[in-house]
Amino acid sequence: MEQLKTFISPQMVNLIMSGQMNYDFSPRRAELTMLFSDLRGFTSLCDELEPEELAPILNEYLTEMTEIIFQHGGTIDRYLGDGIMTFFGAPIPDEKHPENAVSTALAMQAKLSELKEKWLGDAQRELGTGIGITTGYVTVGSFGPKSHKEYTVSGSNANIASRLSKIAEMAQVLISPRTCARVGDLFEVEPLGQRQFKGRATPMMVYHVKRTVRS
């Protein structure tokens, strides 16, 4: 049970431990929404700052982003340097996982703007996130040896979120058609055209989420 605290919110852990919420870590097929966030401009910052200056910045960034993810019911898959892979809809079922993922992305962008001003002040330095989101069926569950289990997702849909984040411009949130179909009336969304991704036989339409439109 201690392992739960590393990838879901303390509130969810308490609900599970009290028996108020069911969960399932065994491998299964499920429709989830995946989010991949990539921090842009951080590599150049690494080259300019000393480790003792850099560590507090990265730790604060990851802490703040994780808190936002947990607030929206997300599950941390893994941290990849300054990147974060997360998913919504497991281990606790959530019908609003596409909406919660997009809301998370916009909240992450807003928080980074605050942090950037705190860290860099008026310095003219580019620092922002590119975020990719997709909704689809993946395999989700606990994998690995007993000594190092990980609760993670696998499948082509999980990879698409990462590839969307890579083509996203700084401070841009890109989503797939399936995610767009589920949240298009809640957010202002702009179609950007077809893109070809590795592992897909046909091009895929990509959408840019600008802002929420729900009152």
Enumerate the predicted regions with their spans.
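Acidic/histidine metal-binding catalytic segments
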Residues: 80, 121-130, 173-179
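Alpha-helical scaffold within the catalytic cores of cyclic-nucleotide enzymes
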Residues: 58-74, 90-131, 135, 156-165
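Catalytic strand-loop-helix junctions within cyclic-nucleotide turnover domains
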Residues: 87-97, 131-149, 170-172
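A structural signal for short, well-ordered beta-strand segments
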Residues: 34, 84, 129-135, 206
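Regulatory cytosolic signal-relay segments
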Residues: 1-29, 187
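Short, surface-exposed loop/helix-turn segments at secondary-structure junctions
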Residues: 120-121, 143-155
